[in-house]
Amino acid sequence: MERRRARSTLRQMSSIELYWLPLGAGGHSVRLNGLVFEAVVARVERRTACDLYHSALVVHAPSGRFVIEQAPVRDNQGAKRGVVAEGPVGSRLAGRFRIFRYEVRRWRNGVIPDIAEAVASPQLLSDDPSQAQRLLDLVPEVPTAVWGLDELDAGEMWNSNSLTSWLLERTGVDTDTLQPPLGGRAPGWDAGLVVARRVSVAAGARGRVIRPEHPLGVV
């Protein structure tokens, strides 16, 4: 009985939540650039332009509450934001300068600056304590590919959505049904899934037990 209560308490303390934020929320220049980008892509693909979304995660685990997000490097105080990795923006050469680098945050008691503008959020993806902790453990392992390029041959550019989908797929969360709010698009999402599944295939080749692969969902 006590063991059952303990498991129940752990589940109440644990969750993985997904937030969808309009691209450039709170930043007018980023939003304008996003609108221009989507207008061009939509024209090339001969479709209606969609709203673009950036994703972030909030993870509750027995070890605490954490914000998982990719964001521009603000200063040299990354440790205060739980930064576990950095990557280049645009090109590896440009990444020598802070303004052209992004940071990967695993921020204890952190904040998502634009959370008030989140749409159809939060989405509860899991209340499994082991999944929550596994996701936290995986954050330092996320690829730090060049933001905005398809450096990993995944079929689309790597960005903040790639970070989110990579972590969810590697954690074992069912990503098949995940998609941005109605009428929206999350560029980079499929790239994270593709790269994460390569890891699973490689693990399977070494004889590890892995989840079966499934077809890519349209995001």
Segments predicted by a language model, with ranges:
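Active-site nucleophilic cysteine motif
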Residues: 52, 149-171
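Charged/polar, solvent-exposed surface patches and flexible loops
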Residues: 133-141, 166, 187, 191, ...
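Non-catalytic ligand/cofactor/substrate-binding and regulatory segments of enzyme domains
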Residues: 3-154, 199-202, 206-219
